[in-house]
């Protein structure tokens, strides 16, 4: 993504052959995919380490499962697929945002250079960028402060 660059330190480590912090070991980053017919909630329930996990841990695991189910065998997500995921699974955060210049910039990046793919880190940054600017998040915070 345009404004999402790895740090110089990160680049130096990677150039020496060390994995980037966002890259999991091959055994973790490329697990066998569950059939698409298995719901995310069932996949999440099958992860033993999360049986007593916190809501935040389960939220991150859910994002990882959605990404993994939609990604290609190399663990990358095509920009068209990412855009479709946003439209189908993140629509409460993106609806009525179309007129915001920042939203338009983010989405136009998904339309450009479609041969480029997103790794998990870029996908999470994309989600967080859209969530942070969304009216839904602002409304949630306003409702919680009044209670």
Swiss-Prot record:
Protein keywords: Cell projection, Cilium
InterPro entries in the record: EF-hand-dom_pair (IPR011992), S-100_dom (IPR034325), S100_Ca-bd_sub (IPR013787)
Keyword presence, Transport: no
A cellular-component GO term for this protein: cilium
Subcellular locations according to the entry: Cell projection, Cilium
SUPFAM superfamilies tied to this protein: EF-hand
Region described as Disordered: 1-36
Domain of life of the native organism: Eukaryota
More about this protein: 'Sentan' means 'tip' in Japanese.
Protein name: Sentan
Gene behind this protein: Sntn
């Amino acid at each position: 993504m345009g404004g999402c660059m790895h740090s110089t330190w990160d680049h130096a480590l990677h150039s020496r052959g060390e994995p980037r912090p966002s890259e999991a070991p091959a055994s973790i980053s490329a697990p066998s995919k569950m059939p698409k017919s298995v719901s995310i909630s069932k996949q999440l329930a099958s992860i033993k380490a999360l049986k007593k996990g916190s809501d935040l841990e389960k939220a991150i695991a859910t994002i990882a499962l959605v990404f993994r189910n939609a990604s290609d065998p190399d663990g990358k997500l095509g920009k068209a697929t990412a855009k479709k995921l946003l439209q189908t699974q993140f629509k409460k955060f993106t609806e009525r945002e179309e007129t915001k210049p920042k939203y338009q910039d983010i989405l136009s990046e998904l339309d450009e250079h479609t041969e480029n793919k997103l790794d998990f880190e870029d996908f999470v940054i994309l989600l967080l960028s859209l969530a942070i600017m969304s009216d839904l998040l602002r409304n949630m915070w306003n409702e919680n402060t009044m209670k």
